[in-house]
Design a protein with these regions (language model features):
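Short, well-ordered loop/turn and helix-capping segments at boundaries between secondary-structure elements
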Residues: 31-32, 52, 60, 82, ...
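Intrinsically disordered or highly flexible coil/loop and linker segments, enriched in small
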Residues: 64, 82, 86-97, 128, ...
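Short, basic/hydrophobic alpha-helical segments
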Residues: 1-7
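Short, solvent-exposed helix-loop connector elements
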Residues: 57-73, 95-96
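RNase H-like two-metal-ion nuclease catalytic core shared by retroviral integrases
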Residues: 11-13, 17-26, 33-59
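Short, conserved catalytic/metal-binding motifs centered on acidic residues
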Residues: 9-12, 84
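C-terminal accessory regions appended to core domains
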Residues: 105-171
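Charged, gly/pro-enriched flexible loop segments at helix/strand junctions
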Residues: 78-119
Length: 171
């Protein structure tokens, strides 16, 4: 569950993202579905970057059997999402236009913040929150653990997760 309103869902052309179940759910939630152009590898550079830094870095490159999906989803929803959104900084580029009108993206020290800090930095950020979600409640989540505490908790959680699912691969 996201604390903010989702207006649009952008996917590549893969059937794992565009199928009857997903389309039906998005229609029911009044969320617009857009997709990438076929065979345009740079359309989803940000998604592919996140896939590498989030999924592959933390779960590895091996095949994950579908039967392990529920326990992996629990790991992501129970602990990892808090780490990712409230404690792990990301770079948000500043766009600079040169004399010729070309836009260049640069990363200044102040451009590094967590996704939650970025949300808070937006003008009228409260307008983007789901009903019943407040900045104060999200602040409590952000402050209940230090960066080191949550990082240690995530590492322990991943260790326990791999101990549950990896024996299935070794047999």
């Amino acid at each position: 569950k996201f604390p903010f309103k989702v207006f649009e869902f952008h996917a590549d052309n893969g059937s794992e993202y565009i199928n009857r179940v997903i389309v039906s759910m998005l229609n029911k939630l009044l969320i617009k579905l857009t997709k990438s152009r076929s065979r345009q590898t740079n359309d989803n550079a940000q998604v592919e970057s996140k896939n590498g830094s989030i999924i592959r870095k933390w779960m590895g490159y091996g095949f994950i059997d579908q039967k392990h999906a529920p326990v992996i989803n629990d790991f992501y929803f129970d602990i990892f999402n808090e780490y990712l959104n409230f404690h792990r900084p990301c770079g948000f580029a500043t766009e600079i236009t040169d004399k010729k009108g070309k836009i260049k993206k640069v990363y200044k020290p102040q451009d590094y913040m967590t996704p939650y800090e970025k949300l808070k930095s937006l003008t009228n950020c409260r307008l983007y929150l789901e009903a019943g979600i407040t900045i104060e409640a999200l602040d409590k989540i952000a402050k209940r653990k230090t960066d080191n505490e949550i990082a240690s908790e995530v590492q322990d959680g991943r260790y326990k997760l791999f101990n549950k699912i990896l024996p299935a691969y070794s047999s």
